């Protein structure tokens, strides 16, 4: 009985952690992060660094596979951040 209670408690804590990373819009994310993912599972992710996967910035701030690049970097035609 005690083991089941502990397992349930750990599971609830893990679910709370997952929910805290979810986002619905850019406003839900802290500086240096964007809201990206599928319609059903968006998470705050860090902006892309040099050589990392990216999506070009858009006026709707809707991203599916990754975030735009950090400042002073641009998203290339192969969706990788590089020097501007």
UniProtKB/Swiss-Prot annotation:
Subcellular location: Secreted
GO MF, any single term: toxin activity
InterPro entries named among the record's database cross-references: Prokineticin_domain
Species this chain originates from: Cyriopagopus hainanus
Signal peptide: 1-21
Family that this chain belongs to: Belongs to the AVIT (prokineticin) family.
Keyword Secreted: yes
Keywords, sorted A to Z: Disulfide bond, Secreted, Signal, Toxin
Name listed for the protein in its UniProt record: U8-theraphotoxin-Hhn1c 3
